[in-house]
């Protein structure tokens, strides 16, 4: 993993990012237990849930955001003593860092039992499942005659959408569309297959608008009308519609075995506020609170008791919850070998370098 991260972002870039976070959080770990610092994706916790927690306990919650898993993991690899009490991370990272005793054991939390065993297993003993979903394509309905159903549509791009496509910068998701085009697993370790995927991405590069996570891109380019579709995560289209005050964005999971993501929450072992942090996670797993959160975020809840409280239209929304058959066929994000990560890092570095160098 370290080799991958060193190739992914330079040490100086990491230090700059880390220092900016420290400046934002000037109190660091000298803060009182009356506040918790949480590191998570943008737009992934309901404001009224945070307010309900503060009203109940008097403990404030400060939110800090990352926009890709690799950025967060790099920061943690360089210094586990980060000024965050709680971190949201993918299930693979949850296991990696748990092995290093970075996180608290959460098996004693009472409301942990409200989650489906499948998702509990995915996050392990030192993290709890927060949300899950699939990787797919967010697209603007007004610009498509029908939803995108093939991954090739973001690689072998139709003329009408060239220069209007967003990708993701991630060790799995960057290569995922091209690998699916090759009828390969998105987590394959085949050197030949990864090289073929690289050639496909290299050919697509002139027609890619951005490799920035779609929600980050639109927030940094609020006036843009250039984006037609983007590789994204289930639920992102609801955030896009909220941001643009429209109903134009939708989400499609192309044909093939779905690639599933799982977000887990963990408590930093070096936090001075582990008692309150664990209490906050237990609060988030209460069925009524988890239901409020899921409905706001429009993501799939791992909490089966919460799902029973959600409106029918949410539970039956196929852009959030995959049909049972497709879910059973899904590929859950899993740990890649150091050799696989290293090759992927080189490919992604080359692809993004060529993208940035284009006129």
Predicted regions and their residues:
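A bilobed periplasmic-binding-protein/Venus flytrap-type ligand-binding module shared by bacterial periplasmic
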Residues: 136-143, 179-184, 261-273, 292-293
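Mature extracytoplasmic/periplasmic domains
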Residues: 268-328
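Early extracytoplasmic/lumenal segment of secretory-pathway proteins
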Residues: 34-96
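Conserved C-terminal helix/tail region of periplasmic/extracytoplasmic solute-binding proteins
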Residues: 325-359
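Periplasmic-binding protein-like
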Residues: 114, 133-135, 195-204, 244-269
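A ligand-binding cleft/hinge motif common to bilobed small-molecule-binding domains
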Residues: 93-98, 223, 228-247
């Amino acid at each position: 993993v370290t080799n991958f991260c060193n190739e992914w972002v330079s040490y100086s870039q990491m230090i700059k990012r880390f220092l900016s976070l420290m400046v934002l959080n000037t109190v660091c770990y000298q803060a009182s237990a009356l506040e918790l610092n949480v590191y998570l994706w943008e737009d992934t916790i309901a404001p009224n849930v945070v307010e309900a927690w503060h009203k109940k306990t008097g403990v404030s919650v400060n939110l800090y955001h990352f926009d890709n898993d690799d950025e967060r993991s790099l920061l943690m690899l360089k210094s586990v003593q980060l000024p965050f009490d709680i971190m949201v991370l993918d299930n693979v990272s949850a296991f990696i860092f748990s092995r290093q005793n970075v996180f608290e054991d959460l098996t004693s939390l009472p409301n942990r039992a409200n989650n489906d065993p499948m998702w509990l297993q995915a996050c392990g003993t030192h993290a709890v499942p927060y949300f899950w979903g699939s990787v797919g394509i967010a697209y603007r309905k007004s610009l498509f005659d029908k939803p995108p159903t093939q991954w090739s549509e973001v690689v072998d791009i139709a003329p009408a959408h060239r220069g209007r496509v967003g990708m993701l910068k991630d060790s799995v998701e960057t290569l995922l569309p091209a690998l699916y085009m090759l009828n390969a697993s998105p987590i394959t370790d085949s050197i030949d297959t990864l090289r073929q995927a690289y050639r496909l991405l290299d050919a697509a590069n002139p027609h890619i608008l951005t490799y920035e996570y779609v929600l980050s891109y639109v927030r940094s380019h609020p006036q843009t009308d250039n984006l037609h579709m983007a590789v994204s995560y289930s639920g992102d289209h609801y955030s896009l519609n909220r941001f643009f005050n429209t109903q134009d964005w939708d989400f499609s999971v192309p044909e093939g075995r779905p690639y599933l993501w799982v977000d887990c929450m963990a408590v930093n072992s070096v936090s001075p506020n582990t008692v309150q942090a664990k209490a906050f996670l237990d609060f988030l797993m209460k069925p009524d609170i988890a239901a409020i959160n899921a409905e706001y975020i429009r993501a799939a809840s791992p909490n089966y008791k919460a799902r029973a409280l959600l409106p029918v239209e949410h539970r039956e929304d196929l852009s959030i919850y995959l049909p049972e058959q497709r879910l059973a066929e899904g590929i859950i994000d899993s740990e890649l070998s150091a050799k696989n990560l290293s090759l992927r890092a080189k490919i992604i570095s080359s692809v993004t370098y060529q993208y940035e160098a284009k006129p």
